[in-house]
């Protein structure tokens, strides 16, 4: 069953585009981009999620990330 979001596709795409533009503008290599985005996720969890829920949120995020990564050999 498809998941429904409380956020519009347009809003999500706008934010994604803005974040990608910042990384592209700074010619950020992939490893640094992943490091910065990972640190951002960690900071969001640590500052915006109740301590009792942090591990569950992090696990859910990691599982969603793994599920969304393509096994396609092209890059």
From Swiss-Prot:
Gene3D superfamilies: YejL-like (1.10.3390.10). It holds the Pfam family DUF1414. It comes from the Bacteria. Belongs to the UPF0352 family. This is UPF0352 protein Ent638_2783.
